[in-house]
Amino acid sequence: MPNDPSDNQLKTYKETYPKPQVITTSNGAPIYSKTAVLTAGRRGPMLMQDVVYMDEMAHFDRERIPERVVHAKGAGAHGYFEVTHDITKYCKADMFNKVGKQTPLLVRFSTVAGESGSADTVRDPRGFSLKFYTEEGNWDLVGNNTPIFFIRDAIHFPNFIHALKRNPQTHMRDPNALFDFWMNRPESIHQVMFLYSDRGIPDGFRFMNGYGAHTFKMVNKEGNPIYCKFHFKPAQGSKNLDPTDAGKLASSDPDYAIRDLFNAIESRNFPEWKMFIQVMTFEQAEKWEFNPFDVTKVWPHGDYPLIEVGKMVLNRNVKNYFAEVEQAAFCPAHIVPGIEFSPDKMLQGRIFSYTDTHYHRLGPNYIQLPVNCPYRSRAHTTQRDGAMAYESQGDAPNYFPNSFRGYRTRDDVKESTFQTTGDVDRYETGDDHNYEQPRQFWEKVLKEEERDRLVGNLASDLGGCLEEIQNGMVKEFTKVHPDFGNALRHQLCQKKH
């Protein structure tokens, strides 16, 4: 008999609810029979008045909603964040206002490229999205398991995803397209090296890091801003999968990561992460050798050390995956007082695109769904109506300002002010210091055996590409380090013979 909680979910339900509920139609009417349609005689035709069938089938025809265009396959869980260290000198956000304070949260982990039925153990970045239900609104930190990303300008995102997804004619994944994109956008090299290193296939979701990746801005009660980055380190340690083992799991247990997370929580082996921040003053940002808002780069820990903030604990599985995970909507635009945006071009682009895709996928009132609503800070807006609206602010005035005590503003949540200069233009950033940090990753972070595996992993996927793509990628990695390019060229040549 299976021993994992995930294998025994139905048995657990039976034991939890010994008395079955009377089955009903969607309008709550009890049903006499759910095993036969209504017909005129034993062999006669169905009747249009069979509302039990019509009710069931009409809803079944509409069960699916649009799949996420990226991050379609994922797992979710509930938990809490607890402050363990005081950072109020940096941030006035309510959830950080005292040590020991706990804030409920929802997390969603995911792969990026695959569809909702794809395997969990592929070489792919992992989504690491958090929704903090704070007393001053929901804060969504929508990150990944790497501190960097492939591109630094949001205009490239649709084309990157097109190259990552299926070929429009063959409907197959096309490594030529993906490596061609990376070859033509060399700012991606840093993240490509992360992806093809040992870190590229985490061992499930419990043993991977999490990062906000972008540069954000924190503001304290005095109104003083500082730039920051968010980091999450698993208390249970970091582990990755060997590519051979990952390939076997992809066929034998494609839901490996989802299963592992569910069973750990159900067995009360609660996953935990420590949260850290890095901070950079405005003066330091002006003097730094790189663009501090470039998401293809990291802030060196030696110059900007990690500052511990608190811990995140996942202690409750979802009751219904569709309601609590599939309908969950994480959005970088959802910030709270004390957390603000930086000029990071990718972050600025995501502020729009995530909201827009939620409107498409879930409708204009997605924020009213229980999993998305700011239940600890009731929303008071002038937004009204729209499809599936069930919370339309009652009889309050639907305009602002008004003379009828409808709403008021708060002076203490004013955004910080900042200066900006420069000509309005489209600034190409494709050649902005693309190789220095990848070179440090090769020379100082990776050990010799890790470099060998990085080269081998790249050669394995590049081996199926056109020769011109192979040569182009070898050229790019040679710019990182001659040894890197030579080793990759050697392995690709061996595959040809």
Swiss-Prot record:
Q: Which SMART domains match?
A: Catalase
Task: State where heme binds.
Answer: 354
| Pfam families in the record | Catalase (PF00199), Catalase-rel (PF06628)
* Gene Ontology BP, a term: hydrogen peroxide catabolic process
Question: What happens biologically when this protein's gene is inactivated, per the record?
Answer: No defects in lifespan or egg laying capacity. Abolishes ctl-1 enzymatic activity and reduces the global levels of catalase activity to 75% of the total catalase activity observed in wild-type animals.
Enzyme group, top EC level? oxidoreductase
Q: Which domain of life is it from?
A: Eukaryota
Cofactor(s) annotated in UniProt: heme
List cellular component terms (GO): cytoplasm; mitochondrion; peroxisome
Family membership, please give it.
Belongs to the catalase family.
Q: What is this protein called?
A: Catalase-2
Q: Which organism is it from?
A: Caenorhabditis elegans
